[in-house]
């Protein structure tokens, strides 16, 4: 039956039939809905206030066992103030559209009713899997630090795992669809459009902004609109659609914190920046961010621009940013704008105070500023003007607690403006900073307790615990993606924490090669601490999950010490891609504090991490799925990957599967494949619908298969497949092709500009591998085939 629906949708998207006249159009508007029934052309249109068209070219059909009958002769009339009735005579049936406040209810006298239609689905109206209130309950918590560290208010919201495929997490690169996806999310309106679970939506390349929709009506069905989805359903404190015009994808940033802590020195930053410039800049890496440790006073207090440690940073901040920029990179800095130690004596009224007196010092050994005071805002404007003049382009704001709202004990009678709402005061401070540095500077908010009240001003938010440099330490990264990926690229970018890919290092060796503060921090979080680093399989899982979810790609490793095999993992997963979540719900914040690993190990830990990540791709490289299958346990496992059930693909089709990390074409599979995964490893499989002609199925450059390929085209008259790829100079580039039986290789050519490039090739069965050295200019490649029969 689903196969029939897909064929119907393809037909609808390609042609519209003119039907016999059956009366003038009838329009009914009620409860925000407008339905127009045009009997003359046999179509209906459905729109919704604030959303525009929801369904267009709606046709009424009756579905038999082997055929579909479109109703060609019907009449419509209004019933009361909120209904439209439709009656057909060939064949006889009756339909009713009832315009309810949050749903369009559709019913028919036939048990075989079927609506076929188009629904607008431009880039700002994305396919989605919505929260399922009938699924397993979990808790989304954004304030563990405020509650546990300061006795403050806890912010949390209920969420639910889906009943169907709770082990799969879906993402989109480009305008995609899937048979298991039945809803849309309108980014501008913060509204979801939910169809029935039996609905099939399909997108065709020639109609990228439209989805064909097939909606079974076995008696009745509903099309629901869920307004204020992020705020009222998910529990976000505010909703502002993310403007990605300056930052079209999540940034890639090296952060000094987890590998150096407050012991970081100028030489450490320069050494890592030089290494990034030499090894990763060509792959898209761009930011080098200095974290805490550059300005501490004798008691650990902070002065930010006032007192840089001259012993650790002898050349000062301007020299450092210039040095980073000279390498073609961008400089970033960590600070806590809500606190400052330099004005306690001169301006005591600048500070928040306890009801029992005394300045509030809750974090970073630094007193907290009163953001309702205009003089404080003037000070912050001067501070950020100076930082911007020094050349910083990336700002990590820590301690974003919004003390007035979430921390008890503040004496509200002693703040400058007693009438201002705490959230308004907090956002006014962020607004001033944003206006000072401009929209082209990146701000990472480290809420550490504030439930995302900075949405609209932050470009990203650090939404997890500080990671540390081991496999267990990376669980904070996985937990953050697991809990918060639904926010990514919709309201801000998710910064899940710094990733580490260093190889194993014993505790004894770490005491010699790492600062004491780093060793001590890890020992306090994990008992017993066996060492640092992780296996190659574990590192592969880290970079796979970060890259395929589209979150901020932040590194904390001592990069110059990485062996080539680890560097290769980074190169093959950079840069970040403009990925959107499909799953619009939290999978639960299940690790609030690091104490858990003092009593547990990852193998014992019960979590809701996905076993499969499914990135659906629609790009010049093709329309396909990237499935990452992860084994979280310490024993080898085999998982069954059902193409229809798990990935929402067509159950009747065959698929070509390419193993990205193994760089190997695995063959053609019909309905499923069994995937063997080593302990803590992730297999990444590119799954393409099988074509009758030669097709690109993978490349060596990027895990998505999409980044480097700018165009691909098949010319049947010439038996010629050609395309254009962006490559990295000096780095060997490989394309993998599937060649159907009966087709043989003729010639392979590659060129950059006017220069011919030597292209090597190897044929093994149906697999064709073509390699050539990377160039500064785009590489145009072509492959000519010969066929035993017409293609």
Write out the residue ranges for each language-model feature.
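Bacterial N-terminal signal peptides
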Residues: 7-18
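Carbohydrate-recognition beta-sandwich/jelly-roll modules
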Residues: 25-29, 35-287, 311, 394
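Solvent-exposed beta-hairpin/edge-strand motifs
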Residues: 131-142, 645-662, 738-754
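Carbohydrate-binding surface patches
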Residues: 167, 546-549, 554-556, 594-649, ...
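Solvent-exposed beta-strand/loop surfaces of large extracellular or lumenal domains
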Residues: 197-200, 652-672, 748-769
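C-terminal beta-strand-rich structural cap/linker in extracellular carbohydrate-active enzymes
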Residues: 223, 668-706, 764-791
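Aromatic-lined carbohydrate-binding/catalytic grooves of carbohydrate-active enzymes
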Residues: 250-254, 258-385, 392-415
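Glycan-recognition surfaces
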Residues: 346-378, 382, 424-564, 585-588, ...
């Amino acid at each position: 039956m689903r196969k029939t629906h897909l064929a119907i949708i393809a037909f609808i998207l390609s042609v519209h039939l003119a039907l016999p006249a059956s009366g003038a159009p009838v329009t009914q508007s009620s409860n925000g809905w407008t339905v127009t029934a045009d009997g003359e052309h046999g179509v209906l249109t459905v729109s919704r206030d604030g959303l525009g068209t929801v369904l267009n070219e709606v046709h009424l059909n009756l579905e038999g066992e082997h055929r579909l009958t479109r109703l060609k002769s019907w009449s419509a009339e209004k019933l009361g103030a909120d209904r439209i009735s439709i009656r057909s005579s060939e064949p006889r049936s009756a339909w009713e559209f009832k315009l309810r406040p949050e749903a369009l209810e559709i019913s028919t006298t036939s048990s075989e009713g079927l609506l076929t239609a188009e629904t607008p689905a431009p880039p700002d109206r994305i396919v989605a899997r919505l929260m399922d209130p009938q699924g397993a309950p979990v808790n989304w918590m954004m304030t563990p630090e405020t509650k546990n560290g300061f006795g403050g208010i806890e912010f949390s919201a209920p969420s639910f795992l889906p009943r169907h495929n709770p082990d799969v997490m879906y993402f989109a690169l480009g305008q995609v669809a899937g048979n298991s996806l039945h809803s849309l999310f309108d980014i501008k309106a913060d509204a979801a459009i939910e169809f029935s679970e039996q609905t099939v939506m399909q997108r065709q390349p020639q109609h990228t902004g439209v989805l064909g929709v097939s909606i079974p009506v076995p008696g009745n069905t509903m099309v629901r609109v869920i307004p204020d989805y992020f705020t009222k359903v998910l529990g976000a404190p505010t909703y502002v659609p993310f403007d990605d015009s300056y930052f079209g994808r999540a940034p890639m940033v090296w952060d000094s914190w987890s590998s150096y802590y407050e012991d970081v020195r100028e030489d450490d930053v320069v050494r890592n920046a030089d290494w990034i410039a030499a090894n990763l800049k060509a792959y898209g890496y761009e930011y080098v961010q200095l974290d805490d440790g550059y300005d501490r006073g004798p008691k650990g207090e902070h002065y930010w621009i006032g007192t840089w440690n001259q012993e650790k940073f002898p050349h000062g901040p301007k020299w450092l940013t210039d040095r980073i920029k000279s390498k073609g990179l961008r400089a970033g800095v960590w600070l806590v704008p809500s606190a400052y130690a330099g004005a306690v004596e001169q301006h005591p009224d600048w500070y928040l105070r306890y009801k029992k007196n005394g300045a509030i010092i809750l974090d970073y050994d630094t007193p907290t500023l009163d953001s309702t005071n205009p003089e404080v805002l003037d000070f912050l404007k001067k501070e950020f003007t100076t930082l911007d003049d020094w050349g910083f382009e990336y700002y990590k704001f820590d301690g974003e607690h919004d003390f007035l709202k979430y921390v008890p004990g503040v004496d509200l009678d002693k703040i400058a403006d007693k009438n201002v709402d705490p959230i308004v005061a907090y956002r006014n401070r962020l607004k001033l900073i944003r206006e000072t540095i401009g929209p082209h500077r990146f701000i990472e908010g480290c809420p550490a307790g504030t439930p995302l009240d900075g949405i609209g001003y932050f470009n990203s938010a650090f939404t997890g615990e500080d990671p540390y440099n081991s496999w267990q330490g990376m669980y904070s990264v996985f937990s953050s993606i697991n809990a918060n990926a639904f926010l990514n690229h919709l309201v801000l970018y998710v910064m899940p924490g710094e990733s580490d890919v260093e190889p194993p290092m014993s505790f004894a060796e770490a005491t010699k090669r790492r600062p004491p503060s780093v060793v001590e921090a890890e020992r306090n979080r994990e008992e017993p601490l066996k060492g640092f680093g992780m296996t190659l399989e574990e590192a592969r899982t880290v970079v796979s999950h970060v890259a395929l979810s589209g979150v901020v790609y932040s590194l904390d490793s001592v990069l110059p010490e990485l062996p080539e095999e680890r560097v290769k993992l980074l190169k093959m997963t950079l840069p970040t891609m403009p990925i959107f979540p499909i799953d619009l719900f939290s999978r639960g914040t299940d690790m609030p504090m690091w104490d858990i690993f003092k009593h547990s190990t990852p193998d014992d830990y019960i979590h809701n991490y996905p076993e499969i990540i499914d990135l659906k791709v629609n790009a010049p490289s093709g329309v396909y799925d990237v499935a990452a299958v992860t084994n979280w346990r310490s024993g080898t496992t085999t998982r069954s990957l059902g193409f229809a059930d798990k990935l929402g693909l067509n159950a009747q089709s065959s698929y070509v599967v390419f193993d990205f990390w193994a760089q190997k074409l695995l063959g053609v599979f019909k309905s499923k494949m069994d995937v063997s995964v080593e302990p803590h490893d992730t297999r990444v499989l590119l799954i393409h619908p099988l074509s009758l002609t030669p097709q690109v199925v993978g490349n060596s450059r990027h895990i998505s298969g999409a980044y480097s390929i700018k165009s691909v085209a098949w010319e049947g008259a010439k038996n010629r497949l050609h395309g254009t790829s962006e490559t990295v100079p000096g780095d060997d580039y490989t394309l993998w092709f599937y060649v159907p039986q009966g087709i043989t290789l003729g010639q392979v050519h590659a060129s950059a500009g006017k220069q011919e490039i030597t292209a090597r090739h190897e044929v093994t069965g149906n697999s064709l591998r073509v390699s050539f050295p990377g160039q500064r200019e785009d590489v145009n490649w072509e492959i000519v085939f010969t066929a035993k029969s017409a293609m």
